[in-house]
């Protein structure tokens, strides 16, 4: 079973912000899938995708706890037999750069840190989407909670759409090695 979690903040005022790139990916993923059932549980909007042949259910999750408390929602849904994939923004990657890694520290991302603390492990997949970094450290909060410029937004949408396509393949074949390789080699400035 896959537990695919997009990190973001609930509310219309956060919808188009850089910090909500995890939700952008899930929104695009949902347009590519059929047979999703929506449920509200565990402080989250949860879409279930049932696989009749495999007798499995995958979950696409939008935590409604706000970014820094995402661990509360994930802990409520997570079971050890699940493959957890967390999609989030990354200030240290250039705009549109994508990276997948398994395990490791939160690298200062408070949403990821909340999940690590809640689960007591860092053993899960992270899909990082670069949003770049503002010029000044004092501007970080306004930057991540701000909307990207038009050209920046186009690059982020290309990256989010590519990740959504790769998640569709992962849902089908569970090939994490290919998933990681494809996303790590993607260049949103070249691929249209």
Curated annotation (Swiss-Prot):
GO MF term (any one): peptidyl-tRNA hydrolase activity
The encoding gene: pth
Pfam family, one: Pept_tRNA_hydro
Site residues by UniProt (Discriminates between blocked and unblocked aminoacyl-tRNA): 9
Disulfide bonds: none
Known role: Hydrolyzes ribosome-free peptidyl-tRNAs (with 1 or more amino acids incorporated), which drop off the ribosome during protein synthesis, or as a result of ribosome stalling. Catalyzes the release of premature peptidyl moieties from peptidyl-tRNA molecules trapped in stalled 50S ribosomal subunits, and thus maintains levels of free tRNAs and 50S ribosomes.
The protein, known as: Peptidyl-tRNA hydrolase
GO biological process: protein quality control for misfolded or incompletely synthesized proteins; rescue of stalled ribosome
Site (Stabilizes the basic form of H active site to accept a proton): 89
Active site: 19 (proton acceptor)
Signal peptide interval: none
Superkingdom of the source species: Bacteria
Compartments reported by the entry: Cytoplasm
Family classification: Belongs to the PTH family.
Oligomer status and interactors: Monomer.
Enzyme class, broadest EC rank: hydrolase
Keyword set, alphabetical order: Cytoplasm, Hydrolase, RNA-binding, tRNA-binding
UniProt catalytic activity: an N-acyl-L-alpha-aminoacyl-tRNA + H2O = an N-acyl-L-amino acid + a tRNA + H(+)
EC number, as in UniProt: 3.1.1.29
InterPro entries associated with the record: Pept_tRNA_hydro, Pept_tRNA_hydro_CS, Pept_tRNA_hydro_sf
Source organism: Coprothermobacter proteolyticus (strain ATCC 35245 / DSM 5265 / OCM 4 / BT)
